[in-house]
Every structure is written in structure tokens, then in C-alpha cells.
Amino acid sequence: MGGVCSCVFKDDDKKKKLRSNDDDKSRGFSGKLKSMRRSKTSDSYYSDNYGGSRRKSSKPDEVVFNFSGELGPMPPLRNDSTKFMQRNSFMGRAGVMGLEKAVEVLDTLGSSMTRMNPSNAYLSGVTSSRGGKVTILAFEVANTIAKGAALLQSLSEENLKFMKKDMLHSEEVKKLVSTDTTELQILAASDKREELDLFSGEVIRFGNMCKDLQWHNLDRYFMKLDTENSQHKLLKDDAEARMQELVTLARITSELYHELQALDRFEQDYRRKLAEVESLNLPRRGEGIVILQNELKQQKKLVKSLQKKSLWSQNLAEIIEKLVDVVSYIRQTIVEVFGNNGLRDNEGEQGRERLGEAGLSLHYANLIQQIDNIASRPSSLPSNVRDTLYNALPATVKTALRPRLQTLDQEEELSVPEIKAEMEKSLQWLVPFAENTTKAHQGFGWVGEWANSRIEFGKGKGKGENNGNPTRLQTLHHADKPIVDSYVLELVVWLHRLMKSSKKRAHGVKLQETNHVSPPNNRTISNTQLSLSPDFTYKNQLSLEDRLLLDRVQSIRFGPNLSKSQELVGLKKNKKGFKIWALSRSTGNSPKVDLSDKNSSSDLDVLDGLDFAFQ
């Protein structure tokens, strides 16, 4: 009977399914999406012969069990109206997403347009909550702020006066770079524009990283400032006030940089201590662990407080707004001071080989500093210093050095102080250029550079001081290569004469005041014969204090001590009554040699070269 009932139920189910499919097709649906109209409860449930209700299968994979009503599935908590609301909410979310996409496209197109009103300092005060915090970019932003502060400080009135009156008219700059003042002004303007391009490039990069789309593509806005002379002029006080705020935040960020390094060291010590305790199976409540935990907690609190005060917690859009104002002010200041100079290469610069363009400025700076170090102490030098210096010389200097050294014998001999005085005439102004070049190459923009040097802005800096960063005209960057080669050649020749004179003075040879070439009738005495002569002594070369010290050392009588390796117990007497030392264990393996018959004085004469019997 149960089998018959089940068959009847199956036939009824098939008929109802076919009827529902026909209704869906008549409405225009393929069966994948059902009708959104509210259906009756009889469509979803049907009554069986036992007075119970059964649920229709809504999925093709769902199996309909033909059990009694007692074990039938529970009626659903949601009806078709809730399903309809879900479908509507899904369509609503899709519409919102499409609308947001359209808004983003319009924002991108709007940001690419350069219709920005500069009358309000580049949309001043218009910030978005989508900008986000600076967080880990704080250190890179602080490095950029340090560069901007240095550039803005170099454009102050005092530094500009120093550059125009002193630097451009300096004799040293004219010797190395050019004697044309106009060309020097063009080089100075191009340097400032290049520094500005580097600074603004980083601001553009940060703007593209901002979530607020109005700060994207800032390069087009800066190009508009160059091509179109904007009537709006940002006041100097406003730009300096914004820069002062940024410098204050950057200074706190530098403290955060150092404290984060200290926190990393504390964490490493704590982990190392924990590993040590675990390896020894000791409890974690020791005194050392507790101390490290307290230090680690205090350091974390300090780091969190600095993060709140520094660039870490600032809004990136607000920082970019201030940086854009600073870039705009620097651009208009460069135009006011230098005009159109430095915008394109000058025709007078063609044909000049500059050290900076060739990438040789740092190499020549090291050469000059090495020559200065050798000249300061020529008598105490390692053996490989001269070879290292010679190998580092340029090819043009090496080629011209050999004929110059061959003509030294015909020149007048000078003393060591005289040679040093001649070298000092060139080194006293070349060495500062070399030191500035080395300093400029050491600061190549790494993230922690600003943290190791204190950032100062607008605090009465002296003339020519640019946060410790020299300008390129104060380095070897624009120096003419043939001119520098000639100075290096002269210094190397003087250095050769200095080394030669220092060696002669060290061997006790007194230089003649006139020509050092002796007449042919006089016999030249070599240094070796002078040193081996019995009448020769070094005491006439020593001062009174050195002689007294030498006599005191020679008067000390040294007594022989007992060696533990030889096991010398004491003195023994032979048959004749002479005291002898006990022999060591190693002396028994050596053959005995009788030296009583030989004359020791003749051997010493042969060694000293005073015995002429074999000549």
C-alpha cells in the first residue's frame, strides 16, 4: 500500500513541475530566474493524503523524500517576499557599484584637466576624508621636506646676495669653472631648477599615492605654472610658515625614526633572552626577563606618543597641500631671481668637458685629498700609497708626468718647507672644493639621511650655509676637466720632489743651497758609504733632548733572565774554574763548532765592507 501511495505522489509531483515550467516559459523566463511576482503558498507546499504538508524542491539537485509528515522538513522561516527583497538589494548594490565606478571615471577626467583655480592656493582648505594617514610614508615625506627646506633656505635674501656678490666673483670659481659671469649665472640657475625638479617630482609621487583624486597628476599643474605666468603670488610669509610647520613635523619624525630603531633592538634582546631561558628550561619570571619587559613597554609607549605627534598620524592630503604651496612659491622665486636662465642649454657650454657631466668629480676629489694627506706627512707612509695614487691618475696626467719628471734634475733643489709652501698655494683652495664634493656625494637621498643631520629652517643661518649642503659651484661638479688635470699634474710633480727631499733628509744628506750637480773632479760619496763610515754619526742630526734620551737608554745595563724553556738552574764551574751556563735540551742535537781559532774581527770587517783582501 505504501508503494502505491508513493507512486501516486510521484505522478502528482511530475504533473505540477511540468505545469510550473510551462507557466515560466509563457512569461518569457528560461527557468534560471523565477518570476518576481508573489506566488501563493500552494505553489511551494502541497498537502499529502495524510494531512501533512510537503515542500517542493526549489533546486534541481534537491531530493524530495517521501516520508510521513512527522519526519517532514520544517516550514521555512522566510517567504517569497524576502527572496524578492534579496533580489532587489542585489540589484541595488550592483547599481551603486556602477555609480561609484562612473564617479571615479569622472573624477579621473576632472583631475586630468588643468582648470584649477590658483587664487585659493591650489584649492586650499578642500580636503577629503578619503585621503588617509601618512603612516609608513612618514620617513620618505620627512626626507622630501628636508630637501625642500634646504632649497627654500638657499633662496633666502642673504644666500642670494652671497651667491651674486661673492661666489660668482670668486677667483677660485673662475679658475676652475669659467671667467664669464653670465655663464656662471646660467649654471647657478640650472642647478636650482634641477633641485626644484627633484623636489617637485617627489611631491608628484606622493600626490599620486593619495586616495583623494584631486591630488593626482600634479605634474600637469606644475607645467601650467611654468607656461602660464599666474597672477596669483604666494606670499613669502605664508610659504615660510607652511614650511616651518612641515619642518617641525619632520623633526619629530626623525626622533620617531631613532626610537623605532631602539624598539627593534629591545625586541631582539627580549627574544634572545626568551630563547636562552627556554633552552635552559628556566621560568619566564626571572629578573632579567621582567626588566626587559618593562623597557619594552616603555619604549612602545614612547613610540606611540611620537607617532601621534609626527607625520605618521597626519593626513596625507593636508601634507601634500602644504608641499604644493611650497613648490609654487619656489618656482615663482626662481623666475624672479634668475629669469629664464637655466631653462635650456647655453651655446657657450658646448665643447666644455665638465667633471660632473662625465661622472668624475668624486674621483678627482679623492685624488686631491690623497695628495694633501701624503704632503702632510711624507716620511710616514705605507709602501703602497704611492702606487695607489699613481694608478688612480688620469691617462692625460700619466702621459704628461714622465717628461716633467725627466726635467727635474736641471731644476734647483728646494728644502722640504719650501716645497710644502709651494704645494700649499694650490691645496689651500682645492681641498675645500674636494671636501664639498665628497660631502655632496655622501648625501644621495637615502631615507635616514635627514634623521642623522638636524633639520633647521629660518633660524638665522649664516651666509652660504644651506643646512650644511654646498652648492654645485662650490664643488668640482662644474669644473673644467683640462684645467683640473693641469693642477693635479703640478701637485704630483711637487709631491715627487717632496718625497725625494724627505728621503735625503732622513738619510742624513745635507742638501746644497746651489746646484746639486757636483763638479767632475770631486768624488761623489754615496749614502751607503756615509752610513758605513766609522766617523759618521747621527748625533749631529739630533737635538739636545734626543741626545740625552739616547744616552740614558744606552747607560741601562740589562741582566740576563732565566729562561723556563732552557731550564737553567744556575751557573756551573768547569775544571778550570770558569762559570758556564747549563745547556738546553735542544743543544745536544747541534754539532759542536770550535770558533776559537777564527778571528772574529776579520769576519766583521768583511760584513761591513772594510776588508779589502778579497777585492
From Swiss-Prot:
It holds the Pfam family DUF668. Its main location: nucleus. Disruption phenotype: Reduced fertility, premature senescence and severe dwarfism in psi2-1 psi3-1 plants due to reduced cell growth and proliferation as well as premature leaf growth arrest. GO terms for cellular component: nucleus. GO terms for biological process: positive regulation of growth; response to peptide hormone. A lipid is attached at G2 (N-myristoyl glycine). Residues 512-529 have a biased composition (Polar residues). This is Protein PSK SIMULATOR 2.
